[in-house]
Amino acid sequence: MERKRAAGVLLIALLTLSAAKPYVRQVYDGDTMALSTGEHVRYIGVDAPEIDHQGDKSDFLAHEARQLNAKLVQGKPVRLELDLERNDRHGRLLAYVFLENGDMVNELLVRKGLARVLPKPPNLKYSSLLLDSQRRAMAERIGLWQKDPEKPERYYIGNSDSYRFHRPSCPLGKNISGRHRVLFESVYKACWEGYSPCRQCKP
């Protein structure tokens, strides 16, 4: 009887431990997923191509980014590391996501060329690591970096506050204040410095 009781206690303890360790329940795209706890997580410091959710055409390599994210984390336990700002304006948890082997998913997506860096102050703990990984992917011309822009502009306007850059005709670019306004001669130069393309004008 005592042996059965001890076995039952051990089983309950193991089940409790398993339930307490969060795993990835669903992957939405290249930089967003949901945990078994119900929390939605947005990866810090990266911006993956957008998947078509509104009837528009999905961005280049958007589905490939989601597939890699799913391959890395779907159904697996992960460790989350937070930064200074805990949630975004949508209420999603902002995190660096680590696999059991210690690899950071945010960095792996950038290194494979399936996400761009997007610094978001004050969450800048790993910004240098992510930018170094992006520069390597750019130099190797893999993923998003394998092709040049279809309609290049003479210059691009960057915002040093949001780390987004825009076409000269973009209203968002025109409204950037002088102290945050940065000019780039090419998309490549802007991305090399860690700026990410505007979602509206899509440079």
Indicate residue ranges for each PLM-predicted region.
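Small beta-barrel nucleic-acid-binding modules, primarily SNase/OB-fold domains
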Residues: 2, 7-8, 13-203
